Structures are given as C-alpha cells and as structure tokens.
Amino acid sequence: MLSPLIQSTLLMTLGLGTLVTFSSTSWILAWIGLEINTIAIIPLMAKTHHPRSIEATTKYFIAQSAGSATLLVTACLAAWHSGNWAISPSSDPIILNAMTLALMFKLGMAPMHFWLPEVMAGLDLTTGMILATWQKLAPITLLIQIAQDQNNAFILGPALLSVFVGGWGGLNQTQTRKIIAYSSIAHMGWIASMAPFNPTITWVTTLIYCLLTSTTFINLNTLKANKITALTMNKHNQISQMLLLLLLLSLGGLPPLTGFTNKLLASVELANQNLVIYLFMMMMGSLLSLFFYTRMCYLSIILSPPCPTTNLTLWRVTPNKPMALMTMLSINLFILTPQLMAIFIMY
C-alpha cells in the first residue's frame, strides 16, 4: 500500500496533467499532460501488489503507450505539414483521422475498447473510479478541439458502435467493475456523437457522466460489492441499497432521473442535425445498457433476503454530507437542466 503522502502527491500529479492538457495550445504540451496522467495513475493501479492489479497495470500502460505514440507521431506530421505546433485541425484528412483514432483509443471507445474492461476488472473500486472519470477528461478536451472540422462519419460511426458494444458487452458480466467499464464505453459513444456539433452539450454530458459514475463507484465501495451477487447479501445497509437502485437507473438514462439529461440533450442535437435514423439506432443501443442496469436493480432489491424487524439494521448511519450531495445531484439534477445549460452557454 502507498503512504498517504505519496498517494496525495500522485493525485495532485493527476490533476496537474489534466490541467496542462486543458491549458495547452500546442500538441507537444497536450501530449506531455497526457503522459503525466498516465505515469501518475500507474502506481495507484499497482498499489495492492496483487497479480490481477499488476496485469491490469501492464495492459493499461501498453494501451496508453500505443495511443500516446500514435498521437505524438500524428502531431509531428501535423506540425511538419502546417509549420506550427498549434492545436488546430489538420488540413490533411489522413493525419486528422489518425489523431481521432488515437484519442478514441485512449478513451476506450469501440472498436479500440478491448483493454478497458480487462483493466477495470483488475483494479479496486477507488482506482477504477479515477480511470473511468478523471482520466477521460484530457482526451475528451482534445477530441472536442479537432472534431469540429473532422468528417462526421468518422466520429459518428465509432460512437454508434460504442453504444452497441457497451450495451451488448455488459449483458453477460457478473463483476460490477466490468459492468461499469462497458457502461463507460456506451457513455463515451453518446459524448463523442456530440463533439462535432456542440462542444457545450459535450461538456455538460461529460460532467454528468463523471458525476453519475463517481457516485455509483462510491456507493458500490460502501456496499463492498465487487460482484452482482454481493448486492443481494447486504442486509444491514438498506439505505445504500435503495440509493444504488436509483443510481443504476439514472446511469441507464431512465427519466426523470439525472442520467436522462444526457440522452435528452444528445437526442435534441442529433434531431436538429437531421440525423433521425442515427438517433433511432443510438436509442436502440441504449436499451441494452438499460436492460443490464435493470437486472442489477432486480438482484439488488427484489432478490434480497427478507429483513424482519429483529435484524440489526443500520438505519442510523454516519452522516456523509458530500456523498448525500452527490447522490442528490445524481438523481434529481434533471429538473435543473435549463439552468445548467444557461450557465455553460454564459461562460
């Protein structure tokens, strides 16, 4: 295990890497920020010294190295072609397509998604939360910047495939971390489909996804639920079980919960772009994700053993105000969608 000082230093380094990518105006600085992120999370992934975590760390390092190498080569070609390192869409479609593929690979989007479920399965829930949320922000920033002049079909195709792969891959899974990994793939599809059209909606959906996923991971960690079967064995923390049910339905995009906001904003934007058939296929793919979320809720609540009044139930739990705030936003933020959009458009 890592000491608190080293762990705090690594977490601050993670934040530094993301901020470097956010504030960079050249490809070389953006690449450095991505590498700082990768180097900082590797000790966090391998801190348990378990063979599964070491295997997951190795797979993650190889996958991210391949994506970073591709991005660096294409950035060098773009700089040679344009004469500067500025982050701007290249006039060469081959270079632009290679950059997009490299960023999709780092995000774990289909068809370059194979590393993400295996890596997530070997991590603890806390590190998995960082991998599924914070590590997505820097690549999404770069993808938004180059997607405006990208061929829409080159982004919309992998986005649709990610929605179907994320829904289909999660059907036969029993580990909660793998289920969240496939959920992440599906959500990345919805987020990427907005990047060529509306950066504001893309960022709103990204932040909502990070909020929902973080809250779900924290709740699963509270219940010590690494597998679906563990959801039926917790007799004493019924409040967390009820909250987990609502969080899972929100992740599935069931109205009127917060997760429906992402589907609604994306649907309106795609309809405005006259992509009705594409939107219909995205909706059909999201039903697969909703199915396995509903299955988890079924196992969590309906199949739980009876809890008579003689059981020692932890109704008087220790107050946790940050967790309460995150859960409330993850469930009830949908009603504040107009105000949220107004704030993002203003700033």
From Swiss-Prot:
Q: Which biological process terms from the Gene Ontology are attached to this UniProt entry?
A: mitochondrial electron transport, NADH to ubiquinone
Molecular function as annotated in GO: NADH dehydrogenase (ubiquinone) activity
GO cellular component annotations of the record: mitochondrial inner membrane
Membrane topology term reads:
Multi-pass membrane protein
According to its UniProt record, where is this protein located?
Mitochondrion inner membrane
Family annotation (InterPro entries): Complex_I_Subunit_2, NADH_UbQ_OxRdtase_chain2, ND/Mrp_TM
Superkingdom of origin organism: Eukaryota
What residue ranges are annotated as transmembrane? 2-22, 26-46, 60-80, 94-114, 127-147, 151-171, 179-197, 201-223, 242-262, 274-294, 325-345
What intrachain disulfides are recorded? none
Query: Main location per UniProt?
Result: mitochondrion
Enzyme Commission number(s): 7.1.1.2
- Enumerate the UniProt keywords alphabetically: Electron transport, Membrane, Mitochondrion, Mitochondrion inner membrane, NAD, Respiratory chain, Translocase, Transmembrane, Transmembrane helix, Transport, Ubiquinone
Please tell me whether the keyword Transmembrane helix is annotated for this protein.
yes
List the residue ranges forming a coiled coil, or say none: none
What chemistry does it catalyse, as a reaction equation? Answer: a ubiquinone + NADH + 5 H(+)(in) = a ubiquinol + NAD(+) + 4 H(+)(out)
The EC class name is: translocase
Q: Which family does it belong to?
A: Belongs to the complex I subunit 2 family.
Question: So what does this one do?
Answer: Core subunit of the mitochondrial membrane respiratory chain NADH dehydrogenase (Complex I) that is believed to belong to the minimal assembly required for catalysis. Complex I functions in the transfer of electrons from NADH to the respiratory chain. The immediate electron acceptor for the enzyme is believed to be ubiquinone.
- What protein name is recorded for this chain? NADH-ubiquinone oxidoreductase chain 2
Which species? Lampetra fluviatilis
Q: What is the lineage of its organism?
A: Eukaryota, Metazoa, Chordata, Craniata, Vertebrata
